[in-house]
Amino acid sequence: MLRHMLKSKIHRAVVTDANLNYVGSITIDRDLMDAADILENEKVTIVNNNNGARFDTYVIEGERGSKVICLNGAASRLVQKGDVVIILTYTVLQDEECHNHKPRLVFMDGNNNIKELG
């Protein structure tokens, strides 16, 4: 049997911008993408801690070191600058792989610095 499992999580990132007039997606600082093992164009689920919105989009690489978390296009209607979000990716594993699987967890501080890796 195949199971959908958490692959990576950026926990409590702060939205730095929301740009309605841009092709839909989320722009994420390349350093954060690397820390969470997220690739450009990878599907992500965004959870907005401020309003409860949960939606899917894809990733655009942001400038390394910029700390950018910018929701673009229609997704920008679901967040505001300063909102705290969780960014999730998933993978599909066989049952026997699930027990040893460890997701990549990136815990953020209030300034989009990596506080801890888990």
Curated annotation (Swiss-Prot):
CDD domains: Asp_decarbox. The active site is at S25 (schiff-base intermediate with substrate), Y58 (proton donor). The keyword Amino-acid biosynthesis does not apply. Pathway: Cofactor biosynthesis; (R)-pantothenate biosynthesis; beta-alanine from L-aspartate: step 1/1. SUPFAM superfamilies: ADC-like. Pfam families: Asp_decarbox. Belongs to the PanD family. This is Aspartate 1-decarboxylase. It comes from Syntrophomonas wolfei subsp. wolfei (strain DSM 2245B / Goettingen). The gene is panD.
